[in-house]
């Protein structure tokens, strides 16, 4: 399969589910250096550009119906005690090695729900009520990257073996898998929302334009490679978002919290999985160059060594522990 075929399949997925699912999910996986994140961003850009080209050419405004209240989305997330909230505000380091910690929420002064897992506030998710603005940029596709759920360096400092945690940063246990899974569950619920019933448009684009709804605004962290840490609220989903592109190394990993991500998304009945592949030589060159550009190493040679001592180990973990029975498309990216 090539990239253009992937893009067509995503449009087809949306068309096939436009009357039953408010959103559809695309899961992009691949080894470090395969180019999965670049592919996810390219897909987001192209889907949005094609939709925006349609908007410029059409006459008439968008139809926006009443939607779902924010409170209904997080109702199954337990409310944190005052002591737990205070602990979160102070850093929340005591739970950093607990993959069984259940995410909790608290409410800011403006009523916004903040959901946090074992990584504390740096990896938190925010849910708010905010009216859609038809005059704003209408992006129907957004990426949901795993990268924003890297545990912060301050949290890695509190591991029993902090040196190993820093050296193996990027391994499954150095992420807030608790809260990334919680985010995936929340977003899977939004995929199952039923779009407003309207006469079907002549084209998929017209049907999309007629079935937008007011939805909770969901913010989640990204990752700043220069600062080497997660950034709160870097990514935002609104009611305009109809395609969710999940991007990450461990989205089909069959251990601890990671093992439940695919099943949560598959429960929507509207999911597509693509594995982006590349040769080990290509991946090594890409990752070594990236490490050097990010200032993580002092030379390309050091970048190669870091790849072999960390990233390659993570790739082998994936090969040994991938969920079975998942229909997966293969996209070669050498």
From Swiss-Prot:
Keyword Phosphoprotein among record annotations: no
One GO molecular-function entry: ATP binding
EC number: 2.7.1.-
Enzyme class: transferase
Residues bound to ATP: 30-38
One GO CC annotation: cytoplasm
Family: Belongs to the YFH7 family.
Protein name, UniProt field: ATP-dependent kinase YFH7
Lineage per the UniProt record: Eukaryota, Fungi, Dikarya, Ascomycota, Saccharomycotina
Gene: YFH7
